[in-house]
Amino acid sequence: MWVEENESMALPQALENYRKQYRKIKLFQDISSVLHWDSEVMMPEEGREYRSTQIAAVAELTHEWMTDPSFLELIQSAKLTTKELPESERSLWNRELEILMEEKEKADKLPSEFVAEFAKLTNLAHAEWAEAKKEKNFKLFSDRLEELVHLSKKQADYFGYTTEPYDALLDTYEKGAKADQIQILFSDLKKSLIPIVAKAPKFESPFKKPIPIANQTKFCNRLPSILGLTTKESRLDISNHPFSTSLGKGDKRITTRYSESDPLSSIFGVLHETGHSLYESGLSKMPNWPNPLTEYLSLGIHESQSRLWENQVGRSLPFWEFMYPILLNDFELSESELPFQELYKYINSTEKSKIRVEADQVTYNLHIILRFEIERDLINGKTKVKDLPEIWNTKMKESFGMTIENDAEGVLQDIHWSMGAFGYFPTYTLGNIFSAQFFKKFTEEYPDSHNKFASKGDFSDLLSWLRKNIHSKGKILTIENLVSEATGEPANAKYLISYLEEKVKEVSISK
């Protein structure tokens, strides 16, 4: 049981001292998030160099505070004090301090100058990646990527590993995950996905004319509040690559990008990022925020929240029964110009795509498997940066039967490597597995939810279920225990496969 502290429950001084220093570190980490958000959304181009220096300075400062011996003394003193607490409080405090010590031990392995260098390099790399993508020329980014790969390998060496360097990086996003285990999971998943892809129907776009950005913006601005993220605690902007970030309590930022020829891209981008922000919003509502227990559990769990709202909700019939008339109004279209059945079938169409973020939910995981294989070999030294375009294009031909025309639609399409985020990609598919299982359990407990979705656009039952079973748990439980407690069983990919098979069957019947 979680015991919330209040003014009448004064903390022992040792716990108060530890929390004060932790929250100082957290405060500056959030300041760094503000700098990052601004650099992607608002900052003029010529501010990049100095902004990189600012970000590096904050990263170095927070790292020095985290690794300072005096902070360790505060943690150790706090741990001794917990022995005097009642059992109901002691177990949570011990878990909190255990998590923090794991983070501190990891931070202790990285020199401060390395942290500053990595932070500055990734901020500079993003601008060069964006320019290279715009020019469709990998060579404009390859030298910087070479530096990022070098530093990422160095980071893996600092962290240490048993089997391969990639494991050390994977662990930073999904604690305890191992590349060889992921490989087995992905191989089995791929075998199940291939026959689904083969029988899945493809539908043509029902949009016969471009949809102005202003109309798309009007519709997209409605989505977060409909799902449960209020305008008082969030805002939606435009960026080169959709993302979401938490700048602190009551301040969640979402971005998307718009295309007049593909209005669904912005819509599903907003649904996805809103899912992330709803999770962060739920975490910040936990008692005694901020502390190590009120952080997100893993990126796999984080992605489960975004993919659930994007797919299980956003591609469902009840969701579009409610949103369809609103879409017509905002897009200034008639029913004859955009028939409901054509729209719904297209939303759930399966078609091999060159672009991951525009991929349907059936083939999406094949994109993740491709990226996992490439970045694993890259970090493990089996692949060279200069060969990435050729390797990428070959794998796309093998997996999708598609020819890549330029680097922008190939190796440069994703932002992740410019962030030094090697090991991130597998968490998307883990998130898909978790989300299907979570949603299945929710519908069992709330069998009438689809009616509330369709008739009222009421998603409060779902959000409440997620708040209770996922968001409010923070890092209190392990990943395995969270999934088991929420669904009654360990994580199982069968729910994702079943969901995809049922979805393909549904739209095939209506064909």
Task: List where the protein language model places each region.
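Active-site recognition of the HExxH zinc-binding catalytic motif
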Residues: S265-L283, E303-R307
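All-alpha helical catalytic cores of prenyl diphosphate-utilizing isoprenoid enzymes
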Residues: F186, K190, I213-T217, L223, ...
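Divalent metal-coordination and catalytic microenvironments
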Residues: Y18, G160, H272, S306, ...
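Secondary-structure capping and boundary motifs in well-ordered enzyme cores
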Residues: Y50, F114-E117, R144-E147, P212, ...
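A well-structured
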Residues: W2-K175, E501-S508
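C-terminal, non-catalytic "cap/extension" segments appended to globular domains
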Residues: W2-L11, D30-S33, E46, Y50, ...
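Contiguous, non-catalytic segments that form substrate-binding/exosite surfaces or channel walls
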Residues: F118-S265, L462, V504
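Post-HExxH zinc-binding segment in Zn-dependent metallohydrolases
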Residues: E295-S336
